[in-house]
């Protein structure tokens, strides 16, 4: 079974399932391992991890092989790379989406964070003893998106390794994206990255091209909700400043009225990104509703104050109760506006002081009346 690894700060889940769709369109039997769910070919379930621990991974791989899977696409987190959570798993190839500030509570510096991501390229390269030669098709493919943070740096650093490093950019797309229904320039990059790796994996160009038009938003990735609000309402997993800026900018392009952002920042995690998220929302949304997003052991009010420190005089509403915050945006937004509920996406719980209570942004939006 070929195992394909997708790493980067934002976009891993989307690239993973899109690549799986492309390989399936090419007649391959493909499972996947994502933050949201695992698909072994016979069942779908959640592990609670982006990249599960090795014993769980081995069980997943064994079940996939039993089901006749030819391929598995999996998300590879920086934590998993640093901890070698995947053991001696032999990857057939991989892709890098981008690198923006996140997980500095773990990696401490952006340099260490980048090196963890680069280490995945080193792991891919360790499976061959060949010398790095540009364009060598027999080397493990490593598709690198040049559009996002650290893309050029990753391309240059991986280029000295024995890998078939494939540059990908939406500025010079090799596929026609006119039929793509996934909104946002970042999704163009995500789809092109998956397409490049699919082609390197043996999927015919025309097959991948035809599959692009059949992709639909899913799993709280700019997923539109049917609600009683006068505005269009979307749920998205954006939980970094870069992701927040990207998704709000994408929505701006088709919104004639105001763009509303409902968001917070996780507790007991990288606190340095909080004012950056506030700044991103202040610069790309017309109105922000700042709320709680898994405060964990921290004081929600203090997290919100840190977010606000980056917002200047931007218009905002502060409501620590996430349900009330969502309802506030949905009730005040007008026809022609768009509301984007950010941060949790597919998640179905809110963690406060060690207790996880049921909470699904999508369900809360549907309950609004």
Tell where the protein language model's regions lie, with residue ranges.
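Phosphate-binding loop of NTP-binding sites
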Residues: 1-143, 154, 159, 255
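A generic structural signal for residues located within well-ordered alpha-helices
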Residues: 14, 52, 116, 186-189, ...
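Short glycine/serine/threonine-rich phosphate/pyrophosphate-binding segments
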Residues: 14-18, 76, 80-81, 189, ...
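Hydrophobic anchor at the start of a short beta-strand
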Residues: 29-31, 71-72, 165, 259, ...
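Short gly/ser/thr-rich secondary-structure transition/capping motifs
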Residues: 52-55, 74-80, 112, 167, ...
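Acidic, Mg2+-coordinating active-site environments of NTP-dependent enzymes
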Residues: 67-70, 89-233, 308-312, 317
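Glycine/Thr-rich phosphate-binding loops of Rossmann-like dinucleotide-binding domains
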Residues: 82-84, 104-105, 152-154, 243, ...
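ATP-dependent carboxylate-amine ligase
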Residues: 136-137, 196-220, 224-369
